[in-house]
Amino acid sequence: MKIVVIGGTGLIGSKTVAILRQSGHEVVAASPKSGVNTITGEGLKEALAGAQVVIDLANSPSFEDKAVLEFFQTSGRNLLAAETAASVRHHVALSIVAIDRTDNGYFRAKLAQEKLIEGIPYTIIRATQFMEFLRGIADSSADGNRVRLPPVLFQPIAADDIAPIVAEVALAAPRNGIVEIAGPERASFHEIVARYLKAIGDPREVVRDPEARYFGGRVEEHSLVPLSEARLGHISLDEWLRRSQAKA
């Protein structure tokens, strides 16, 4: 089976490509570096020729509200048009849990991307926040030597748990719906970030702040976790930290 992975050289993409190739599939790791650009359309027709499945893992180079919305809308339209022309049979998109319940620009852009998907059998995978992004989350919430976080629940998932699920979903029949995935541990946001910072030797204090926002958006207790049944990964935060430190 020919499978095209858009964003195939990124964090999740590279792992997904490796898994699918090990299973014997013909996999194209598509990215601007390989001559495939979903914004300009360059290389899409050639990359998608003969493909049965497309996995969209592309991410915006900018997180500014207007720029990220334009990226996902333009990329999504170009990619889906190319898939229609190539008679692709399954479109898989990686998205984010709670994007329809959280008010920030990036989440709004991902929701707009989801809404573009029509006319092609599809599966949307909504994941909770990646463990690999914990440092960025802490930095974005920093106020001097303190990290201010809203009093909400958090359930991050490791990239090594996400990629196998993405590969499995891509090889299965389209669901024409949404699959939610999350990490195995649910705890308070500040507790998880505090554990992470302590483990890496970061002395910043983590505090609960009801006025704190998440990347500019207000969140409530369950805004960042699945509300119903979700498929859970196996890698705990402690295990992920152990693996990360072993690689360092």
Question: For each predicted feature, which ranges?
Answer:
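Non-catalytic, hydrophobic alpha-helical segments
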Residues: 12, 54, 162-166, 181, ...
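Glycine/proline-rich active-site loop of Rossmann-fold NAD(P)-dependent oxidoreductases
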Residues: 132-143, 169-179, 185, 202-203
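A conserved pocket-lining segment of Rossmann-fold NAD(P)-dependent short-chain dehydrogenase/reductase
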Residues: 123-124, 136-157, 161
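N-terminal Rossmann NAD(P)H-binding glycine-rich loop of SDR-like oxidoreductase domains
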Residues: 1-23
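NAD(P)H-binding glycine-rich loop region in Rossmannoid oxidoreductase-like domains
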Residues: 22-86, 96-101
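Conserved beta-loop-beta element that borders a ligand/cofactor-binding pocket
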Residues: 90, 95-100, 115-133
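Mobile cap/lid helix-loop segments that border enzyme active or cofactor-binding sites
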Residues: 193-248
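Glycine-rich Rossmann NAD(P)(H)-binding loop
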Residues: 148-153, 179-186
